[in-house]
Amino acid sequence: MLYEKFEYNINNLIGNFGLSKIAVAVSGGSDSVALLYLANIWAEKNNIELSVISVDHNLREQSKQETYYVQNISNSLNRKHYSLSFDHQNNFSNLQERARAGRYDLMTNLCLEFDILVLLTAHHEDDYVENFCLRLERNSGIFGLSSSNINWYNNIQIIRPLYNIPKSELVEYLVSHNIKWFEDESNSSDKYRRNIIRQKLAKGAGYIKAEIILQQLKINDLLDNKFKPELISAIAEAVKIFEYGFAFLDLVKFDKFSNEVKVQIINFLLIIISGQFRAARFYSVEPILKLITQDVNFKNTLHGCVVKRIQNELLIYREFGKKLPESKILLDKSIIWDNRFCITKNQENPDCVITYLSLEDYKTIKKQLDLAHLKDLSCKNHNAILFTLPIIKILEKVIAIPHISYYDNDMQNFEVSFAPNFVSRFTHFC
């Protein structure tokens, strides 16, 4: 029975989490509609509040009908439904990737707003097989070819309880229960490589899919038993991350690890230092690895970071001037700025703006800044790093740069910590 398989999966994935709330992402397609009905049964049995989230990407005429249909199903099940909208701003470059990131941003932000810790998605067995083929075409390594049934995004746990259930079983379940769903016409378009792979797999013999699943399991096992522990050791031994939001990599210690792990370390640092959520592609990281082997000092930019070799160390800090962080008003007690720093005010102040240091502001306060400590820690790269730090302004005046203990008056009311909003499935343990 499908439900029994689903129940076994979700109980194993969630464990003893003690949840009272959970959310499910539903588009209106067969996979997510089946997930909604299965999750509803499970939530009723376990007395858990289930919320339903739909995201309209505003790319197809049918999408609004799909959202309306999901809303009707949710109402019939007495479940709260939230309809979100992705604004593509008429920018169609790299649209699939941007739409995916936008979708997860919207859904996880909603989860955070309502204290929901877990989001269910409808990735099923066929999706895993297709992903494996796509990544194999891109020459992905062990980490890229591996799969996970639990991921993290924006500090929300993303769980995939259909991971070992083929699409055919989900469709059969819906048909047997007389449940309708929508077909996304883009799934039949040759415009997308995934669709071409799906068609080839459908025409192939059943043993091909079985062999891919077996290879996936072997890779996952290799990752869990060899490469994940090596990655954790490498980060502990070779990486130093500083409160100023930059990092040093010890290249002597770094050299002893496998190439697979080296790529992941560089990507790990690029993500947390840049404040981005997505990893750089291997072809972008590879030139840096080659430069490291040449044993010469260099300075490059990659993934929103400056990567600079200084003797036997690699310095990585945020690139200033490219995609500058947004200014934010500190209305609550604390706020995350640039996806990297948590700023907390210890007492009531007039509305403060958290932003970056402009050249004009720097010239005004330059003589009052004590950068000695930052200079020592960063091997004299203090001026560049200074412009990546959060500053606090009131009425366009810089009143504080907490990292370097600069305050315009005696009231030291702010605390700043480096708290990048990123969790890796390779370094996080539930």
From Swiss-Prot:
Its EC number is 6.3.4.19. Belongs to the tRNA(Ile)-lysidine synthase family. It catalyses: cytidine(34) in tRNA(Ile2) + L-lysine + ATP = lysidine(34) in tRNA(Ile2) + AMP + diphosphate + H(+). InterPro entries: Rossmann-like_a/b/a_fold, TilS/TtcA_N, tRNA_Ile_lys_synt, tRNA_Ile_lys_synt_N. GO terms for molecular function: ATP binding; tRNA(Ile)-lysidine synthase activity. The N-terminal region contains the highly conserved SGGXDS motif, predicted to be a P-loop motif involved in ATP binding. Its main location: cytoplasm. GO terms for cellular component: cytoplasm. The keyword Nucleotide-binding applies. The keyword S-adenosyl-L-methionine does not apply. It is an enzyme of class 6 (ligase). It is found in: Cytoplasm. SUPFAM superfamilies: Adenine nucleotide alpha hydrolases-like. Disulfide bonds: none annotated. Ligates lysine onto the cytidine present at position 34 of the AUA codon-specific tRNA(Ile) that contains the anticodon CAU, in an ATP-dependent manner. Cytidine is converted to lysidine, thus changing the amino acid specificity of the tRNA from methionine to isoleucine. ATP binds at residues 27-32. Gene3D superfamilies: HUPs. This is tRNA(Ile)-lysidine synthase. The lineage of its organism: Bacteria, Pseudomonadati, Pseudomonadota, Alphaproteobacteria, Rickettsiales.
